[in-house]
Amino acid sequence: MKTRVAVMFGGKSVEHEVSVISGIQAIMSMDQEKYEVIPVYLTKKNEMYVGEEIGKIEAYKDIPGLLSKSQRVILVNEDDHIVLMPYPVRLFGKKSIEVDIAFPIVHGTNVEDGALQGYLKTIGIPFVGCDVTSSALGMDKYASKVVLKENGVPVLDGYCFTTSDYAEIDSILDKVEKEIGYPAIVKPVDLGSSVGISVARNRS
């Protein structure tokens, strides 16, 4: 009997489109002899959809059209049976799809940072990949740096500044110039990959 895998991709993230590509590439690479793959698309509102076209990359050229011919679902645990249930629930609606495990192929905040993993864990759904804590740590660049450094892994020096700290921007720049120097890499603490990264070569 094949393992039924709900491959989840997309989601409420600035890396939404990259996640769609990653998810479909993962689906295409999975052994169809071992796995019954159920593609699950998460919209930019984190709504879940399944359907015949969900696993086809060309369908994402027209997302409203794709959703109109797909079925919105919710992922639930019914007496230890994991199902993708059509939403809204109707007495004589479409049947639920039973799955064995979820496989999140997601990038960025709101999905890769432990949020989706926490949701899956809360409702008791087995999933592939990092747990909540490691997902959250991996997404927070400064927290990752601190944990690595505390465990003897060589890392470059860095500082984390919040939005409120920018009221003292001159003090921040003084600290950067004194303790790090230029060029300095400036990046959001919790966006994925290289999103938002820039290089500061001087004070201005």
Q: What does each model-found stretch correspond to?
A:
Residues M1-T133, L137-M139, A143, E150, ...:
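ATP-binding N-terminal substructure of ATP-dependent carboxylate-amine bond-forming enzymes
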Residues V106-T109, Y159, V189, R203:
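Anionic group-transfer/hydrolysis microenvironments
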Residues I97, V153, I180:
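Structured loop/turn residues at beta-strand edges in well-structured enzyme cores
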Residues S198-S204:
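Conserved ATP-binding module of the ATP-grasp superfamily
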Residues V147-V155:
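Basic phosphate/pyrophosphate-binding loop/patch that engages nucleotide-derived ligands
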Residues L148-K149, V176-I197:
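ATP-grasp fold ATP-binding core
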